[in-house]
Amino acid sequence: SHDTQRILSCLSDAPPKDTLTREQQAEYQYKPEAVVRGKRRLYAAFALMFSMPQPPCIYYGDEAGMMGLSDPFNRGSYPWGREDPEIRSFVMQLSALRRCNAAMSSGKTAFAAPCADAFAVLRCRGEESALTLVNRADHTVCAALGAEDFREGPDALNVLTADKYSDAFTDGTVLQKDLGTGHIRVEIPPNGFLLLLSQTAE
């Protein structure tokens, strides 16, 4: 919404907009390390949004890395030619994944919370499965998830995890289900995410 501060500003630890005067907002300088952390959080937020059953909705410019606190600083002109190339490329990749993957775009949906700092979305359609996990903590979260852990959402307890997943955004790391427990073991990076796509049996 155009009535709220930009998401990248919020995730880069900007102070609440009501605590600064308009002049202070105009001159506010973000700490570089906070922006780096903010981008990691932004990628996790985008990954979560694109994994949900409803159509993704992005406020113009968020995909370009625009920042700003309250009006009018949150409603600047689109930065043509000055977009953040990494954020823009990431959103394009996410969009392509959702468009080409039936599970992400129209699959059954169920949710799980491995711990207080992590959240998981499982989407399934036919033979395809997409598992998205986000971590809001400043440390790595390790978890082991099975289909029985997905107890919330419209299709709770009516979804299945795949036997094998590959990481869609890193090095293509393949994760296999433990056939004894039926669980997939994952390590979710600090302030980050994993987006895992099922692999067909060879």
Give each language-model segment a name.
Residues 1-202:
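Active-site and adjacent substrate-binding regions of carbohydrate-active enzymes
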